[in-house]
């Protein structure tokens, strides 16, 4: 059996060589050891799944865009081909999302004792149910969107005991606001969430420890960018 230390090292090798499927396998073995993950291990498992799922999310978006173009041209034969191909990508996405969500609920959350760890993995649960909602429809979409909302809400309640400038709390607010904007089509709620997180953090900016200053300010910038984009979109809609 490979030691935890070696699995973490192999995971880093896989990351550096952009072999993310293998990175996932190494970090899954670490998670299944049944003890709380360190900050480094937490970030490694997050990066591994983000890349494995992210590449397929990007593929799905490209294919969906091409499908719309062919539909507009009236190319029914091509549309059928694209639909079959899109279904293949959706099946892969479903498998990957199911895989990460199982690891989160069965191991990562159960073994989390620190507030940071609990918020990190509850946010991650919200993220993967959100990704699920991007490519599903009807009842399935409603089911995963509800689960995403519940996970984000629980993470937000727990994160209240972290300082407003904490990168995990800020990252959660960023993703939760994106959930409202993209999945719930609720621009008002998205803006309210992003603005609150940004305003609370800016008041405490002078208290941010040096080691997390860069991370905190980067996420704050992303919150502000989204706010600018969303408010201008809302203006256009009016």
UniProtKB/Swiss-Prot annotation:
Gene Ontology terms: biological process: protein localization; signal transduction
CDD domains assigned: 14-3-3 (cd08774)
Cellular-component GO terms for this entry: cytoplasm
Coiled coil region boundaries: none
InterPro entries the UniProt entry points to: 14-3-3, 14-3-3_CS, 14-3-3_dom_sf, 14-3-3_domain
Entry function: Probable adapter protein.
Annotated family: Belongs to the 14-3-3 family.
Entries under PANTHER family matching the protein: 14-3-3 PROTEIN (PTHR18860)
Protein name: 14-3-3 protein 2
Organism: Entamoeba histolytica (strain ATCC 30459 / HM-1:IMSS / ABRM)
